Amino acid sequence: MARLTTRRSRIGAALLASAAIACGASACGNGAALSEARTACVKIDHSIKLYKQSLVAPTLAAASALAAHAQSDLLAALGPASRATSSDGSFNALMTSLQESSRVPEQYLVESLQRQCQVVFSSTPYLAS
């Protein structure tokens, strides 16, 4: 009887350890997703700054170069946003907005991307009105 109790204790301890490892791994996944989303938002922020500079550039050539660099930064943000979404579906809106950047002019995406990144960097998943 004592051997059976000891065996059950070992099995219970092993199951508890497995559950703890699984919970820890899933928490790490969400942390990694947040980190990837923040990486994407840093690129997005840089892109928006370049885009706004392109609007007031002194020459057409400078404006075109800045706009192209801004577009390139938006596309570079797609990788981290995709990885964030793969780990945590709550970042899907960010990834989807970035995917639209190849079809929609940046001027129409700026506000949406800024708000989504505001949520990424906040401590709550909601924005105050």
What is each model feature region?
Residues A2-L15:
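Bacterial N-terminal signal peptides that target proteins for export
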Residues L15-A22:
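Hydrophobic helical h-region of N-terminal Sec-dependent signal peptides
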Residues I21, A33-L34, V110:
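Residue-level signal for mature regions of secreted extracellular proteins and peptides
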Residues G24-A27:
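C-terminal motif of bacterial Sec signal peptides marking the signal peptidase cleavage site
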Residues G29-G31:
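Bacterial signal peptide processing site
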Residues E36-P58:
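Post-signal peptide N-terminal segment of mature Sec-exported envelope proteins
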Residues K49-L50, A68-S129:
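Extracytosolic low-complexity repeat regions of secreted or lipid-anchored proteins
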Residues V56-A67:
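Amphipathic alpha-helical segments
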